[in-house]
Amino acid sequence: SYQDFIPEIDLYERPTDYEENGNYVFVGVRQCGKSYMLYQRIQRLLHEGHDIREIVYVNFDDERLKMMKAEELDLILQAYAAMNEGKPLLFFDEIQNVDGWEHFARRLANQKYRVFITGSNAKMLGRDIATTLGGRYWTRNVYPFTFKEFLGSKGVLTLQTEKSGEVADLQWMHSPRVRAAVERAFNDYFHFGGFPELRNIVAKRIWLNDIYNKIFFSDLVVRNKVRNDNALRLTIRRLAECVRQPTAYNRISNLVQSTGVTC
């Protein structure tokens, strides 16, 4: 079944607080680690004594579920009830692929199910979620790794737990070997960013280019019905070149028009 592989996943745990009976939606850019937040929560629940049979994890990116309709979502609950007693803990990955999913999600909250959902920013922006789910879910924004998390995920810095919380072991400052490892990690982080998946990818630039194109076309062009994607692409490039510098709209407009692209 879907969830059988989750206990075996080697995760870098990211700190997140949960209300005991809260329902949660994790939103963020593609490949920022939203699914891993679900895996992390499932592993924590299993560690606390929950049985794997209490967990229902469904990945709606699965091609076998591409044609699923909102009225068929209740089949998940019916199938669970046929095999188990009690209410399951529900984990739905990329549920926004099912049109009308929000009605099902609201009903689950009203019926006191524990639900954890992920969705891409393309269809599940934070401001949309508040309206769509009627305040029944907590929203958690997920971002790529910070540099501290990046170091931790690569095992470069050890962390020691004290009564005051987690603090970095500063002994690395006196170790040339570890210091060199930190500098190499920073160079990697500076050039490629903190997407968790990049840790295991050799062709990082190709992977990033693929993610950029998916975000550009699916999350920007299609979502906002942009008619001139070339003008948008040039605008993004100009803004990326002017990080931390004021940029006038007229300057961008003139730049785009000078290339023969009409806004």
Could you describe each region identified by the protein language model?
Residues 157-263:
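Interdomain hinge/linker elements that couple catalytic modules in large macromolecular machines
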Residues 1-16:
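N-terminal pre-Walker A segment at the start of P-loop NTPase domains
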Residues 26:
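Hydrophobic anchor at the beta1->P-loop junction of P-loop NTPases
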Residues 30-31:
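Walker A (P-loop) phosphate-binding loop of P-loop NTPases
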Residues 34-35:
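Conserved lysine of the Walker
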Residues 114-120, 141, 150:
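Structural recognition of the conserved hydrophobic beta-strand(s) that form the central parallel beta-sheet
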Residues 56-88:
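Short glycine-rich substrate-engagement loop in P-loop NTPases that contacts/grips substrate
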